[in-house]
């Protein structure tokens, strides 16, 4: 079976991650003690591929294939005392006592480096338990110290050890207006530098965009992190539903990557989810494939603060869940591309992939998850990069990092590495089909002369 190993790090990662496990347990009929509680009728579907995310332990308990890490015990304690706290294998909670203090260098070089071997041992143990490991999914934020510093350290170590497995990350970027710490731009830039090199697919999330969705679409006046994490977990569950349930058009992490990544460094995706409705208005909304399609391509639905209308889609993927006709899904997708052709690059024809999974999320008739590779994601990088430069020019707060043994050179390097994807996205946003052809002709001429 194609297993996925889930790793969550830092406060943000652990909070998103534990919410995700609540959703997954719910979808597979697993109760907080790890026992299966579904009916006989559901059991075929729920249990057929439950081992993608769960290990079956003695006595028929299902244990998540999850590794939880943090540099301070606080978040772990609250997960343990939470509703699904007893479901995780106790050995898989690896934590330090010191904390990273929002300092990337502590997470990556000093505190995190001391704890990393313990985490890797657990990861190896879990990986050996797998039949045919498909890949890893990592939940972390890029603004803090542990999720960003230690998270990227773990990603690079896992990359070294399992070079041929997919590495999918759910990365929460610092948002433009909501800032928790002053040094977010530093931490994020140093992390992006790592993600460009070592991750295969990055789902970019952002608190501000999530707040906007809660506020505007869900009509929540005071959204809590719980509400935001609920949105994220719905999306996470949607991205992997094809692996966990039978469907007419299934995809896995690798198929997703092959269809979404035209060039290796351009692997930062925007995600969206539909239907998003406020709690009171569900009964007034009919769920049809056109409705879902319209909502999921809507710029307001994107979970990161970049506007897809400011760029063009290189590729996109739509995952539908529920009983629906594949033909209708395909027609809708073609329809979207024809109507909005200016928002798609013309040098990748048919660049929207769709997949259909027969089992909808709990409580919905149908739903869809959107993953898009849009050049407008460079807005995110640009914004962080500007904030980084403003502080780095004055060498503000730098002593916290150099004190942990970092070098100023690393900052300069990270800054230019952050600007690489920006330039690359811009280049392909401006490229037209004709540029490419001229280029090919020139290349062909060169070859004739060389031979």
From Swiss-Prot:
Location of the region described as Disordered in the Swiss-Prot/TrEMBL record: 413-451
One term of GO molecular function: structural constituent of cytoskeleton
Annotated GTP binding sites: 11, 72, 141, 145-147, 207, 229
Record protein name field: Tubulin beta-1 chain
Bias (Acidic residues): 432-444
Membership in a protein family: Belongs to the tubulin family.
Keyword tags: Cytoplasm, Cytoskeleton, GTP-binding, Magnesium, Metal-binding, Microtubule, Nucleotide-binding
One Pfam family of this chain: Tubulin_C
Binding residues for Mg(2+): 72
Main location: cytoplasm
Cofactor: Mg(2+)
UniProt cross-references to InterPro entries, sorted A to Z: Beta-tubulin_BS (IPR013838), Beta_tubulin (IPR002453), Tub_FtsZ_C (IPR008280), Tubulin (IPR000217), Tubulin/FtsZ-like_C (IPR037103), Tubulin/FtsZ_2-layer-sand-dom (IPR018316), Tubulin/FtsZ_GTPase_sf (IPR036525), Tubulin_C (IPR023123)
Subunit structure: Dimer of alpha and beta chains. A typical microtubule is a hollow water-filled tube with an outer diameter of 25 nm and an inner diameter of 15 nM. Alpha-beta heterodimers associate head-to-tail to form protofilaments running lengthwise along the microtubule wall with the beta-tubulin subunit facing the microtubule plus end conferring a structural polarity. Microtubules usually have 13 protofilaments but different protofilament numbers can be found in some organisms and specialized cells.
Function as written in the Swiss-Prot or TrEMBL entry: Tubulin is the major constituent of microtubules, a cylinder consisting of laterally associated linear protofilaments composed of alpha- and beta-tubulin heterodimers. Microtubules grow by the addition of GTP-tubulin dimers to the microtubule end, where a stabilizing cap forms. Below the cap, tubulin dimers are in GDP-bound state, owing to GTPase activity of alpha-tubulin.
Superkingdom of origin: Eukaryota
